C-alpha cells in the first residue's frame, strides 16, 4: 500500500537534505519513491491575489531581494475568510496530483501544515494549527499519510539562509 510522507519546516530547517537522505535510504531498502512539491498550489488563490492587489491588501515593497508583493490580507476579515476557503479548495484539487503518483512512498515537500502557517500569518489567525481549519485541511491528506516537521536551532537557520 502506498504511503505518503509529508516533510514540513521553515526555510533553512534542512527539509531538502532530510528528503534527499530519506529518499536514498528508502530506495536502498528496495522501496520505490516519488517526490512532489505540494506548496503553493494556487488555482483560485491566483485570482484572490490579483484582487488583493486591486483592493490594496497586497502592496509592492522593496527589500534586499528586490521588489516583492507583501500581503496585508488581515485588514479585511471577509477577504481572509474567502482566501482561506479558496486555498482549501485549491489544496483539495492539488491532492489529485499526489494521488496519481505510483510508488511505495510518496514524499511530499510541504503541504497542509505549511499552507496553514502561511494562511495564519497572512490573515492573522491565531493558533491556526489548533483551529477548525486544521481539521478541514487535515482531511485533505490521503490515507496512510505521516507528517514530519523538521526542527533546527534558530542560529543554525539564520546562519545558513541569508533571508532568514
Model-predicted segments: where are they?
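Walker A (P-loop) ATP-phosphate-binding motif of ABC ATPase nucleotide-binding domains
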Residues: 4
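Hydrophobic anchor at the beta1->P-loop junction of P-loop NTPases
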Residues: 7
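ATP-binding Walker
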Residues: 12-13
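Walker A/P-loop
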Residues: 16
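Post-Walker A helix-loop "phosphate-sensing" segment adjacent to the P-loop in P-loop NTPases
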Residues: 24-35
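ATP-dependent small-molecule kinase phosphotransfer cores
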Residues: 40-128
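Conserved phosphate-donor/acceptor-positioning beta-strand/loop module used by diverse small-molecule
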Residues: 104, 108-114, 130-131, 138-161
Amino acid at each position: 500500500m502506498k504511503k505518503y510522507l509529508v516533510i514540513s519546516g521553515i526555510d533553512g530547517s534542512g527539509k531538502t537534505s532530510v528528503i534527499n537522505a530519506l529518499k536514498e535510504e528508502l530506495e536502498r531498502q528496495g522501496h520505490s519513491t516519488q517526490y512532489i512539491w505540494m506548496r503553493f498550489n494556487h488555482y483560485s488563490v491566483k485570482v484572490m491575489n490579483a484582487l488583493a492587489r486591486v483592493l490594496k491588501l497586497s502592496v509592492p515593497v522593496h527589500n534586499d531581494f528586490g521588489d516583492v508583493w507583501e500581503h496585508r490580507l488581515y485588514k479585511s476579515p471577509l477577504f481572509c475568510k474567502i482566501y482561506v476557503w479558496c486555498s482549501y479548495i485549491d489544496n483539495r484539487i492539488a491532492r489529485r496530483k499526489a494521488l496519481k503518483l505510483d510508488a511505495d512512498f510518496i514524499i511530499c515537500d510541504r503541504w497542509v501544515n505549511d499552507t496553514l502557517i502561511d494562511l495564519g500569518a497572512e490573515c492573522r489567525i491565531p493558533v491556526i494549527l489548533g483551529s477548525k481549519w486544521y481539521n478541514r485541511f487535515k482531511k485533505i491528506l490521503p490515507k496512510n499519510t505521516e507528517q514530519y516537521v523538521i526542527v533546527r536551532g534558530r542560529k543554525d537557520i539564520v546562519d545558513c539562509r541569508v533571508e532568514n
